[in-house]
């Protein structure tokens, strides 16, 4: 069914679901250069890639049993992970809103990030922010982030945080031989930058691909936290119940986003900074 999907339209009854909603800000042919974005209601991951699908599974995947079926049992009782082909995400009961800002031609422009962030603050554009996103996961970024280069984005991130949204982004994959490199938008004050950790024996250490900070030029203590980001198994696009293994800070970010969603559930009155 996935292989025959027409990404330019949403088939009746297929989307949105109780679990997943979203929007495509770019359209299939948008490259970020001379093309005009053609938004539509289907944020399906681009064919042959699967980055967004993998990230979504880490945040809120329900898990796949050995019988090849989505898990629909109790997550609070002790789970026997040996009975899973694909383990559940960090916050498996969370609802996902997939916002697609890249076309299928290339991933070389973040021109539509601001549009997506404004949507996160007010999804139905009615000037009532009560329906804002609780957590904004940004598994993207440029290699070198400079605070003063991104003033418009910084203001939006600050406003989202004031509204109560937790914004999480990757520190970047600039490797541990380079310091003073943190990817934008993780470089911003109000964004939680996540580094990538790997299991080394019985201890988690910073993964070789992960940026280590601090930020440039103000030497902010970034990243603020690390999370698993090497040899991470999650949902594989187009398979229904299959998995794939990816590396990168993009996979560390949803671990923190999922934890933030659980914190929001347990403490709905907490501010984003709390």
Named regions from a protein language model:
Residues 5, 68, 79-81, 113, ...:
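Active-site-adjacent substrate-recognition loops and nearby beta-strands
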Residues 96, 103, 120-147, 170-171:
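Short acidic, glycine-rich surface-loop motifs adjacent to enzyme active sites
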Residues 18, 92-97, 129-136, 162-167, ...:
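Loop/turn elements at helix/coil->beta-strand transitions in domains of secreted/extracellular proteins
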């Amino acid at each position: 069914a996935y292989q025959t999907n027409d990404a330019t339209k949403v088939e009746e009854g297929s989307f949105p679901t109780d679990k997943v909603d979203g929007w495509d800000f770019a359209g299939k042919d948008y490259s970020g250069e001379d093309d005009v974005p053609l938004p539509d209601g289907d944020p399906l991951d681009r064919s042959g890639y699967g980055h967004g699908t993998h990230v979504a599974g880490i945040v809120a995947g329900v898990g796949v049993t050995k019988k090849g079926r989505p898990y629909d049992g109790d997550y609070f009782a002790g789970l026997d992970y040996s009975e899973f082909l694909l383990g559940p995400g960090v916050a498996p009961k969370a609802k996902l809103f997939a916002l697609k800002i890249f076309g299928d031609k290339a991933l070389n422009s973040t021109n539509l990030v601001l549009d997506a962030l404004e949507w996160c603050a007010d999804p139905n554009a009615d000037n009532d922010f009560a329906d804002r996103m609780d957590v904004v996961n940004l598994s993207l970024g440029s290699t070198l982030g400079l605070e003063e280069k991104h003033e418009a984005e910084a203001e939006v991130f600050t406003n989202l945080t004031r509204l109560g949204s937790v914004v999480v982004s990757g520190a970047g994959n600039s490797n541990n031989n380079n310091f003073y490199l943190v990817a934008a938008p993780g470089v911003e004050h109000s964004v939680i930058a996540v580094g990538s950790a790997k299991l080394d024996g019985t201890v988690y250490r910073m993964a070789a691909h992960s940026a280590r900070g601090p930020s440039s030029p103000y030497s902010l203590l970034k990243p603020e936290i690390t999370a698993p980001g090497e040899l991470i198994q999650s949902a594989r696009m187009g398979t229904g119940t299959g998995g794939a293994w990816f590396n990168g800070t993009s996979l560390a970010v949803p671990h923190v986003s999922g934890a933030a969603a659980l914190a929001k559930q347990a403490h709905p009155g907490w501010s984003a900074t709390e």
